C-alpha cells in the first residue's frame, strides 16, 4: 500500500496534529488500562524528536455531541501523558480557532466527540481541524473504519496527511497477511455466529489454503456435514451457506469435541455454571441430543496444531472454545501454543483472541497483534477503510 509515513517526513518546526486512539477505560477519574496510551507513546515521542510542535486528539467514550461531561474528558489522559513524557501536557478544551504550541512541546485537545459534527464527518469541522496543523498524522487504526471529521475529513483538508507508525505497522502486517501471503496460509475463524463472521469467512475462503473454524461457527459447519450438534449453539438457517464456503476452501472439521450436558448449564450464569459442569470428550459422531459442544477435543487440537505448524501465514480471529473456563479451554490453549511455536508469519485480532493470547502468555511469539477490533475485521472482509482510503488518495 502506498501512503505517506510520518517517519519519512521532515517535521522540524512543523505543527503536527496526531489522531490517536486514547479511548481508555476510566473509573472515578482513574485510568484502569493504559494499553492504548502505551501504544501511542512511541509515535508522540518520534514526532517530538523530529522537532515538531505536537497536538494530539482522540475520542473517549460515546458522549452526546455538544454536551461535554467531566467523566468523558481526556483530563486523566493529559495527566498520564504529563508523567510519561516528562513535560506538562496541557489539555485544551477550546481549540477549534487555534492552539498555541511550541516545537518540542505536546498539547492534548479535548474529546473530539464533544464537537458537533464529529461523527457525521462535517466538512466545516474537518477544515477547522486541518487549519490547526501543517501535517495531519492518522495513527488510530481502531477508528480507521469510521469516516469521521477527526479520522477521514481532516485528512482531506490538511496540507499533508500521513500514517503514523502504529497505523503503518497495522497496514503492513494486514497487507502481508491478506494481499501478499506466503503460502500455505491458514486462517482460524471462531465465534458464536456464522452470521457475524460471514463476510470474513467468504473473504478468507478466496485467499486461504485451509480455514479452521471454531465455536458456534464450527457447530454450523458440523451440522452442514450431517452431524448431530445436540443443544449446541448453531445457525440452522446458515447450513447451506456453510456448505457453499466448504466447497470453496478446505475446512477441516473436528473429529472429537468436548461437551457438557445442557441441563447442567444456566444461561443466566453461563460461565459460572460451566465451571461446575462436567466436561466430557466425545467423538463427533457420538454427540447426543442433550449435549452442548463447548470446545474441540484433544485429537482435533493436535490435528489443527499440525496444520498450523506447516503453514507459512496464519491469521487468527477467535478462540475455538469457551476458554474462560479451563475445562473447555484446552483446544484454544493448544492452538495458541501452536501459533506461537510456528515459524509462520502470524497476525491475530479481535477482543476474545487478545484475551486468549494474554491468558496463555504467548503475545511475544505472535508476529503481529492487531489492536483494531472492528477495523481489523473490516480489513479482513476486504472492505475499504475510509481513513486509510484518504491516505492512499493523498499519497
Curated annotation (Swiss-Prot):
Keyword Iron: no
EC number: 2.7.2.3
Compartments where located: Cytoplasm
Coiled-coil regions listed: none
GO CC field: cytosol
GO biological processes: gluconeogenesis; glycolytic process
Top-level taxon: Bacteria
GO MF annotation list: ADP binding; ATP binding; phosphoglycerate kinase activity
Record's catalysed reaction(s): (2R)-3-phosphoglycerate + ATP = (2R)-3-phospho-glyceroyl phosphate + ADP
Binding site for substrate: 21-23, 36, 59-62, 113, 146
InterPro entries attached to this UniProt entry: Phosphoglycerate_kinase, Phosphoglycerate_kinase_CS, Phosphoglycerate_kinase_N, Phosphoglycerate_kinase_sf
Residue sites binding ATP per the record: 197, 324, 350-353
Keywords: ATP-binding, Cytoplasm, Glycolysis, Kinase, Nucleotide-binding, Transferase
Pathway involvement of the protein, from the record: Carbohydrate degradation; glycolysis; pyruvate from D-glyceraldehyde 3-phosphate: step 2/5
Subunit text: Monomer.
Family of this protein: Belongs to the phosphoglycerate kinase family.
This protein's name: Phosphoglycerate kinase
Name of the gene this protein is made from: pgk
